[in-house]
């Protein structure tokens, strides 16, 4: 009798992606973040669905509806904080997943990598619009500042901003459309995830040594399903500790004040996971230049396959590139810290130096060091 998982068309696709998928025998815990991202997306969609049942996208009642969810709905506080902190966990896993891809040269799988970068943009757009929905002070002013960046686009900028706002300022129309987009985007993200996974079996998984592992493959189930379960349990432990013990640790106190267009908060800043890009934006005095630097700070990931000059794929056996990689990581931490600081001396200078360093490492230093390492191989 033939096995249903190998013959039934839809089940066969799942089987080839998660059960009988041939996986290298030496992949480390860094490869767990893909499945953890899937879990984060599932948590976000489910908690978001329950929140949407009670939320109202109207400027007069949005803030009150979130308060109502926390106070009156059964376990509403838990659902709300799981959704808010779930976004943070999502981005932690995303950054680690991308970092692993950079370290081990996974960007040489062009289709998978480029769809991954598009996914990153889609998730960032979703998170930004979600931050606007509670209609607190930081929601309102964050939406105003970030959407206003579009006005830097020549000729069509102002018209484009007013078109996004649905009026002459961030108001009811803006909130309603942001809620609509915030609701639909996660499902688009889920569809993109399917495409992302679809390209993976075409090339097979990468591995830490970056050597061809065709001669030594093992089935994904049970070996890596068990390994992923450990990652899931650890993630849920950290996640629930954050949600139950310090749910407001990563939030902004200003968002507990209802939105007031007449009162600007002293420091307007986005959520922590956007701070590195926000710091790059602020470090350039010109508005259009800042916007271009902001977009390019993420879009630069698509250039990695072109900038790869090394004869080796991974950084595992390239100590000089490793040093640069960890300097880049430290630089991103610095940018994140600077993004949350007021615009004054010495933070402006630190931000500018860190921004220049970020682009210099990626565009100049890494390719140059890779070419030097190629020479050293012959030495």
UniProtKB/Swiss-Prot annotation:
<keyword id="KW-0812">Transmembrane</keyword>
<feature type="transmembrane region" description="Helical">
    <location>
        <begin position="113"/>
        <end position="133"/>
    </location>
</feature>
<comment type="function">
    <text>Component of the ubiquinol-cytochrome c reductase complex (complex III or cytochrome b-c1 complex) that is part of the mitochondrial respiratory chain. The b-c1 complex mediates electron transfer from ubiquinol to cytochrome c. Contributes to the generation of a proton gradient across the mitochondrial membrane that is then used for ATP synthesis.</text>
</comment>
<dbReference type="GO" id="GO:0046872">
    <property type="term" value="F:metal ion binding"/>
</dbReference>
<feature type="transmembrane region" description="Helical">
    <location>
        <begin position="226"/>
        <end position="246"/>
    </location>
</feature>
<feature type="binding site" description="axial binding residue">
    <location>
        <position position="83"/>
    </location>
    <ligand>
        <name>heme b b562</name>
    </ligand>
</feature>
<feature type="binding site" description="axial binding residue">
    <location>
        <position position="196"/>
    </location>
    <ligand>
        <name>heme b b566</name>
    </ligand>
</feature>
<dbReference type="GO" id="GO:0045275">
    <property type="term" value="C:respiratory chain complex III"/>
</dbReference>
<keyword id="KW-0999">Mitochondrion inner membrane</keyword>
<feature type="transmembrane region" description="Helical">
    <location>
        <begin position="178"/>
        <end position="198"/>
    </location>
</feature>
<dbReference type="GO" id="GO:0006122">
    <property type="term" value="P:mitochondrial electron transport, ubiquinol to cytochrome c"/>
</dbReference>
<feature type="transmembrane region" description="Helical">
    <location>
        <begin position="288"/>
        <end position="308"/>
    </location>
</feature>
<dbReference type="InterPro" id="IPR036150">
    <property type="entry name" value="Cyt_b/b6_C_sf"/>
</dbReference>
<dbReference type="InterPro" id="IPR048259">
    <property type="entry name" value="Cytochrome_b_N_euk/bac"/>
</dbReference>
<feature type="transmembrane region" description="Helical">
    <location>
        <begin position="77"/>
        <end position="98"/>
    </location>
</feature>
<feature type="transmembrane region" description="Helical">
    <location>
        <begin position="33"/>
        <end position="53"/>
    </location>
</feature>
<keyword id="KW-0679">Respiratory chain</keyword>
<dbReference type="GO" id="GO:0008121">
    <property type="term" value="F:ubiquinol-cytochrome-c reductase activity"/>
</dbReference>
<dbReference type="InterPro" id="IPR005797">
    <property type="entry name" value="Cyt_b/b6_N"/>
</dbReference>
<dbReference type="InterPro" id="IPR027387">
    <property type="entry name" value="Cytb/b6-like_sf"/>
</dbReference>
<dbReference type="Pfam" id="PF00032">
    <property type="entry name" value="Cytochrom_B_C"/>
</dbReference>
<keyword id="KW-1133">Transmembrane helix</keyword>
<keyword id="KW-0496">Mitochondrion</keyword>
<dbReference type="InterPro" id="IPR005798">
    <property type="entry name" value="Cyt_b/b6_C"/>
</dbReference>
<keyword id="KW-0472">Membrane</keyword>
<keyword id="KW-0249">Electron transport</keyword>
<dbReference type="InterPro" id="IPR016174">
    <property type="entry name" value="Di-haem_cyt_TM"/>
</dbReference>
<comment type="similarity">
    <text>Belongs to the cytochrome b family.</text>
</comment>
<keyword id="KW-0479">Metal-binding</keyword>
<feature type="transmembrane region" description="Helical">
    <location>
        <begin position="320"/>
        <end position="340"/>
    </location>
</feature>
<dbReference type="InterPro" id="IPR048260">
    <property type="entry name" value="Cytochrome_b_C_euk/bac"/>
</dbReference>
<feature type="binding site" description="axial binding residue">
    <location>
        <position position="97"/>
    </location>
    <ligand>
        <name>heme b b566</name>
    </ligand>
</feature>
<comment type="subunit">
    <text>The cytochrome bc1 complex contains 11 subunits: 3 respiratory subunits (MT-CYB, CYC1 and UQCRFS1), 2 core proteins (UQCRC1 and UQCRC2) and 6 low-molecular weight proteins (UQCRH/QCR6, UQCRB/QCR7, UQCRQ/QCR8, UQCR10/QCR9, UQCR11/QCR10 and a cleavage product of UQCRFS1). This cytochrome bc1 complex then forms a dimer.</text>
</comment>
<dbReference type="Pfam" id="PF00033">
    <property type="entry name" value="Cytochrome_B"/>
</dbReference>
<dbReference type="GO" id="GO:0005743">
    <property type="term" value="C:mitochondrial inner membrane"/>
</dbReference>
<keyword id="KW-0349">Heme</keyword>
<dbReference type="InterPro" id="IPR030689">
    <property type="entry name" value="Cytochrome_b"/>
</dbReference>
<feature type="transmembrane region" description="Helical">
    <location>
        <begin position="347"/>
        <end position="367"/>
    </location>
</feature>
<keyword id="KW-0408">Iron</keyword>
<keyword id="KW-0813">Transport</keyword>
<protein>
    <recommendedName>
        <fullName>Cytochrome b</fullName>
    </recommendedName>
</protein>
<feature type="binding site" description="axial binding residue">
    <location>
        <position position="182"/>
    </location>
    <ligand>
        <name>heme b b562</name>
    </ligand>
</feature>
């Amino acid at each position: 009798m033939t096995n249903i998982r190998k013959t039934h068309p839809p089940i066969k696709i799942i089987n080839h992606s998660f059960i009988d998928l041939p996986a290298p025998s030496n992949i480390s815990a860094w490869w767990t973040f893909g499945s953890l991202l899937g879990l984060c997306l599932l948590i976000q969609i489910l908690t978001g669905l329950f929140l949407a049942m009670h939320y109202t996208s109207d400027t007069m009642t949005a803030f009150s509806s979130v308060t109502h969810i926390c106070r009156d709905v059964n376990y509403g506080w838990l659902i709300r904080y799981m959704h808010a902190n779930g976004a943070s966990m999502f981005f932690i896993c995303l950054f680690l997943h991308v970092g692993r891809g950079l370290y081990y040269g996974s960007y040489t799988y062009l289709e998978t990598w480029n769809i991954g970068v598009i996914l990153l943009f889609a998730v960032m757009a979703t998170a930004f619009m979600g931050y606007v929905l509670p209609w607190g002070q930081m929601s309102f002013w964050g939406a105003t500042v970030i959407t206003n960046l579009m006005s830097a686009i020549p000729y069509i900028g102002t018209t484009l901003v007013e078109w996004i706002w649905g009026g002459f300022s961030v108001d009811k129309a803006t909130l309603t459309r942001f809620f609509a987009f915030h609701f639909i985007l996660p499902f688009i993200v889920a569809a993109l995830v399917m495409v992302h996974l679809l390209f993976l079996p075409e090339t097979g998984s990468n591995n830490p040594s970056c050597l061809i592992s065709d001669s030594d493959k093992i089935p994904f189930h049970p070996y890596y399903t068990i390994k992923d379960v450990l990652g899931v349990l650890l993630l849920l432990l950290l996640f629930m500790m954050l949600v139950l013990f310090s749910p407001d640790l990563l939030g902004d106190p200003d968002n507990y004040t209802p939105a007031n267009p007449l009162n600007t908060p002293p420091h307007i800043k986005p959520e922590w996971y956007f701070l590195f890009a926000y710091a790059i934006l602020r470090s350039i005095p010109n508005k259009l230049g800042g916007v271009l630097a902001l977009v390019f700070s993420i879009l630069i990931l698509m250039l990695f396959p072109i900038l790869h000059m090394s004869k080796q794929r991974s950084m595992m056996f390239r100590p000089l590139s490793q040093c640069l990689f960890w300097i880049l990581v430290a630089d991103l931490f610095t940018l994140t810290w600077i993004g949350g600081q007021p615009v004054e001396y010495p933070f402006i200078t630190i931000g500018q130096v860190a921004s220049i360093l970020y682009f210099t490492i990626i565009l100049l230093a890494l390719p140059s060091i890779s070419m030097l390492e190629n020479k050293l191989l012959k030495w």
